[in-house]
Amino acid sequence: MVKLDFSSQDEENDEDLTKEFVRDEAPMEETTSEAVKQIATTTKETLKDVVVNKVIDVKDVVKEKVMQQTGMPEWAFVFLGFVFILLVLACAFCLIRKLFGKKRHGEKNKKGGLKGFFGKGQDVVDGKNIQGMAQDLEELGDAMEQNEKEQAEEKEEVKLGRIQYKLDYDFQQGQLTVTVIQAEDLPGMDMSGTSDPYVKLYLLPEKKKKVETKVHRKTLNPVFNETFIFKVAFNEITAKTLVFAIYDFDRFSKHDQIGQVLIPLGKIDLGAVIEEWKDIAPPPDDKEAEKSLGDICFSLRYVPTAGKLTVVILEAKNLKKMDVGGLSDPYVKIVLMQGGKRLKKKKTSIKKCTLNPYYNESFSFEVPFEQIQKVSLMITVMDYDKLGSNDAIGRCLLGCNGTGAELRHWMDMLASPRRPIAQWHTLGPVEEEGDKKDDKK
């Protein structure tokens, strides 16, 4: 009997089947994983698209509702958003500068001078603070330039010294007692470096009474101790200004004015004795004073329903000297004009021997409402002369031919009907030869 042994053959067959199964199983696993990944990716993309579409839909719905409620176009929302972003950035910049700027300035002050900028501190070495350092350097440069300018101005400013005086007003007697006590640190006006100072006193605006101290030879610190009395009523003293004019005496030429001190008596307490020092100010510029013609104050009022234009000449000040004695006899001439033709002319009273006349005189002109924009008003300050012709000092031109402050005054009057509008004006030159002279009053 023959026995057949199939064990080894079966084992070999099993091994072959196992190998084939393993070879077939590997591709199956790879295919499955790839499919799973593809499904996951597709799902994510689909979900992302859905979410984005939903967000866009919600945004569109909100935008439409807001636009319907506010009535604003789309570009307006874009503009407002841009402005909001700019405001946020500006606030952030200011906050950062406020927080860190103080710290830098504090450190600079502690270290002193320029050391805080160019020392070995961490704020300079750290690259993050380079921009802040550059900004501080720029500010420092500007501050240094400003300091240099101020120092240059201080060097150019000449010290004229100061003067000590005493004021005492007697209300019962109506008199002002002025004592010139002393002066010190006066500038040297002579070749030797000294001066021969004296003080001239008078009251503005009249300059009628002038008094002088004695001359003190070759000194920059004179002691005067001289007293003078001015008769001034109490109802007039508040409009006066006391002048201390300091001069250097010269025997053979014109005396040079060192400087002056002005005391407005309306701004001090006359009920008490005043004794104080005052710095001496530079003297007035004679050339500029000669060019100035003065100022005039008047009010304008127009009533459209009545067609009535009212001009009130109030006062004038600092008028140009026209007479030999250094004064003038001023009056004011008002001329209503249209198309170069004079419609009506009126004049104030004459104020004798003054450069600061007070009038408070009213004049009326009939001007219909349809003509008010076509007329001009020429206000001229004249100097009365008893023997010769009256000369013009200066004038203002208002109305349709006016310019600058005169035109603004006229427009303010028209914008405020029935209400008087008062204003000061600087007198301009009278260019027309025919207006420089006037007939007798």
From Swiss-Prot:
Residues 159-278, 292-425 form the C2 domain. Disruption phenotype: Worms exhibit severe behavioral abnormalities that are characteristic of deficiencies in synaptic function, including severe locomotion, feeding, and defecation defects. Increased survival in response to hypoxia induced by sodium azide. Reduces the formation of neuron cell corpses in a hyperactive mec-4 or deg-3 mutant background. It is found in: Cytoplasmic vesicle, Secretory vesicle, Synaptic vesicle membrane; Synapse. Gene3D superfamilies: C2 domain. The keyword Repeat applies. Ca(2+) 3 binds at residues 250, 253-254, 256. SMART domains: C2. Localized to regions known to be rich in synapses and appears to be associated with synaptic vesicles. Also found in some non-neuronal secretory structures. Ca(2+) 2 binds at residues 190, 248, 250, 256. The chain crosses the membrane at residues 70-96. It is a single-pass membrane protein. Signal peptide: none annotated. Ca(2+) 5 binds at residues 323, 383, 385, 391. GO terms for biological process: calcium-dependent activation of synaptic vesicle fusion; defecation; locomotory behavior; necroptotic process; regulation of calcium ion-dependent exocytosis; regulation of nematode pharyngeal pumping; regulation of neurotransmitter secretion; regulation of synaptic vesicle exocytosis. Residues 1-69 are vesicular. May have a regulatory role in the membrane interactions during trafficking of synaptic vesicles at the active zone of the synapse. It binds acidic phospholipids with a specificity that requires the presence of both an acidic head group and a diacyl backbone. Involved in necrotic cell death. This is Synaptotagmin-1. It comes from Caenorhabditis elegans. The lineage of its organism: Eukaryota, Metazoa, Ecdysozoa, Nematoda, Chromadorea.
